[in-house]
């Protein structure tokens, strides 16, 4: 089996409050729908708490894939960690996604050549195709350096219209070990979930909206209820909604 590690480092308050790695959990949950991936790759762990970079690198067991979810509060740390992982494991497929990755910066990958692929916007489809070894030139939503060292941008992402096809990482048990770890360490891990994706507006301060994400798709209400029930059962103190525009649908 090929080993996979996924990171989504939280903002930290007093060193005790963290968040579940919801975005990377969705990536892995969706990839598990593919039998080839299930039989080829093994998720070793999620990293959600920052540590000394050398400590994280030394904890890795021959990683085949190392994925990082980038936000404004962790991008610099992510880049240093990515560089260290690539130095220690040059054959590891190193992926970077999230709103911290610029969409149209032709110098980004030239400045950080240790990143193999940047995944833009929705990541579930592109992540799955990369694990399957699909020709990257045919995968929407990617940027990477071609053989001449130039940045190649794929076509815009194809969105997942039936978003309930993405299994809930909470409900399929991906975060059960984190709940156990949090209790052992005496830390608080807070929940993140979505009731919908997309937004019809184009606010300049927001990563949502625009042409690609103007259509809003709803998660089934029962799924959202079941996730909240899971969090209540596991004594999660705070739940954050990752919707671009919560409450846009009056009937929900």
Where are these regions (language model features)?
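Short beta-strand segments
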Residues: 5-8, 45-47, 67-72, 96-97, ...
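A general structural motif
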Residues: 1-2, 61-63, 91, 139, ...
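Glycine-rich beta-alpha loop elements in corrinoid/cobalamin-binding modules
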Residues: 30-33, 39-160
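Tryptophan-centric aromatic hotspots in well-structured domains and transmembrane helices
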Residues: 30, 73, 108, 128, ...
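N-terminal [4Fe-4S]-dependent radical SAM core
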Residues: 4, 12, 136, 145-192
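Radical SAM [4Fe-4S] cluster-binding motif and immediate context
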Residues: 23, 170-252
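Glycine- and acidic-residue-enriched helix-capping/strand-helix junction motifs
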Residues: 13-24
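Generic structural signal for well-ordered alpha-helices
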Residues: 28, 79-82, 191, 228
